[in-house]
Amino acid sequence: MQTPLQLQQTEGSDASAAATRGFAEFVRNQIQAHAGTLPEGFPLDVTDVQDLKDARIAYGFPVYTVNPKDILTPRSDFSSMARPTGVWRFLISRDNRPIGLATVEKINGTWQTTSYGGAGLSKDLDALMQFHGNANRSNLRFIRIFQARSDFLEVASGNGTTPRFAPLQSAREALLQQRASKTGSAADAAGGLVDASQFAESLRAAVQANLANFR
């Protein structure tokens, strides 16, 4: 029986293969249909669809989330409550520059690319992952709180202390989160790492407000 880590590695490998296949097909279709142009609202950061010929699928990561009920009434710490969604996202790069993300999900038992986009998120995320990640980024988790429209990068320390978080642009905007400058090391302050307690109240309020809007 595979361990949870081995299962994630197998899942990641299968999802990566699907992302690569899907992107190759996407590039062929876009060049065939729109060569020499760029359709309005194109999901990736290129100036011409021909640029896609030089783009590739880079690394991927699973998407985690926290149940809104656990945010409103915490039963544990933020990290412990995070669970995988079953969705993977893969960074797409061109000339070593992020141009967007591919979203991959398992549908009827088969991994498939379901969407492209997130050009701004890809740049924000890649910069933070390079700054905070170890060699294989195994110390990082991407956590999306759907009901607060907020994304966080969890950064686990190597010494077993409580993980800290880098709020991504969506979280910085939605929660009016300021970069940490009074706590942690100089490197932490520069990278914008905060404790979960520093955004818990704002996150709870955002989730509560958004859930109320759907009633």
Placement of each model-derived feature along the sequence:
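Exposed beta-strand-loop-beta-strand "reactive/processing" segments of non-cytosolic proteins
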Residues: L44-I107, D151-G158
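Glutamate identity and glutamate-enriched acidic tracts
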Residues: Q2, Q6-E11, E25, E40, ...
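Phenylalanine-focused residue identity feature
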Residues: F23-F26, F42, F61, F78, ...
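Intrinsically disordered, low-complexity regions
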Residues: S13, T37, F42, N159-T161, ...
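Generic signature of intrinsically disordered, low-complexity segments enriched in small/polar residues
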Residues: F26-N29, D45, P62-N67, S93, ...
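A short, surface-exposed interaction/processing loop segment used at functional sites
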Residues: P98-F146, T162-R215
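Short, non-transmembrane alpha-helical segments in secretory-pathway proteins
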Residues: Q2-R75, G117-N139
